[in-house]
């Protein structure tokens, strides 16, 4: 039943749009979290590095 199947370019276009939306959403979340982490890292940098070294050993 080829009539029910959507055209190949339409499927490709939808997948591309979905990929772009997900990428933009993830990039926005990561950017906000990164900026927040950088903002607080200046206050807790020594605690974070000390905890990181303790956990790695």
Swiss-Prot record:
Residues 1-8 are virion surface. One of its GO terms (biological process) is symbiont-mediated suppression of host NF-kappaB cascade. It comes from the Viruses. Residues 30-57 are intravirion. The keyword Endoplasmic reticulum does not apply. It is found in: Virion membrane; Host cell membrane. The keyword Transcription regulation does not apply. Keywords: Host cell membrane, Host membrane, Host-virus interaction, Inhibition of host NF-kappa-B by virus, Membrane, Transmembrane, Transmembrane helix, Virion. Pfam families: SH. Belongs to the rubulavirus small hydrophobic protein family. Plays a role in the inhibition of the host NF-kappa-B pathway. This inhibition occurs at the receptor level, by preventing the signaling of TNFR1 as well as IL-1R and TLR3. This is Small hydrophobic protein. The lineage of its organism: Viruses, Riboviria, Orthornavirae, Negarnaviricota, Haploviricotina.
């Amino acid at each position: 039943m080829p009539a029910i199947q959507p055209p190949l370019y339409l499927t490709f276009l939808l997948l591309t749009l979905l990929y772009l939306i997900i990428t933009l959403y993830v990039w926005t979340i990561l950017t906000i979290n990164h900026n927040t982490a950088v903002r607080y890292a200046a206050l807790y940098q020594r605690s974070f590095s000390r905890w990181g070294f303790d956990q790695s050993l």
